[in-house]
């Protein structure tokens, strides 16, 4: 399975964009109404960017409740289709309310939170072509800049780095993180500071700067020891999350045996369900690199799919790993049956 750095290197060698290598097939797997919903989100973002959001002016309390419910549903992997269906109207209503000029400071904070913790994650879940996520990051960045306080700016930096990583823009991801200084004087900002440190470690691992991986991880671990397991801003930051990012970084730099060893010492149930799904994905990616653990890799991916099908079936790296596992699978084994069923659901040739 290719790592982010390997995908970037291949794209450079072929003189194409990373997004061309990671594009989903048409029709996309696990589709339902996902593609039509993505188009509705696209139109909502376009309307806002053109200055005509076309929503309804609503009280800040109503909008806060809707944003909170949406972020919470994504953290719990509940009603992901319904979240997508509700997202365009929420984008339009929130930005229409900002334009109306009442409670603007609070609404700007909500805009940064909505786009970084709901719009971008849902679009990633849906397997978009990254341009929509970049539009959402730009809107969040504008809101955070106007608000001018550390937390919204930090949320944008973390989400922006994630999007930049996926297109192989490692320098851009690092630059966005370098300009952020996050205070740790509240439990919420302490968790956000820790999460930003985790993101810095991920960027270093993807960029093959192995000497820069451990320091931010250790800082995050220090903060996690003080915060315990938390979920400020929907980040699910805590000791387990630090361990999971450590696993992810080890997969990126190619230390698969150590990644598996650390993963097997974690308790994914200590996190929200979205992070649980990513735990099983990262664990599966590491297992898939160990020839004698392929069956375990299949079972790990199946655990992730049971929590959130889209996170497996629409993820380009996981799809590539499933295809590789298929080529090496032992016909007739229990894991082979599970693998082939999963591959069919992903739209892969079996």
Describe these PLM feature segments.
Residues 4-20:
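DNA major-groove recognition helix of helix-turn-helix/homeodomain DNA-binding modules
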Residues 15-30, 242:
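Short C-terminal boundary/hinge segments that cap the last helix of small helical domains
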Residues 23-54:
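Short, charged recognition helix plus adjacent turn
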Residues 38, 60-64, 336:
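Onset of an N-terminal alpha helix
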Residues 53-61:
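TPR-adjacent "capping" and linker segments in tetratricopeptide-repeat scaffold/adaptor proteins
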Residues 1-2, 27:
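Recognition helix of helix-turn-helix/homeodomain-like DNA-binding domains
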Residues 66-350:
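Conserved binding/catalytic microenvironments
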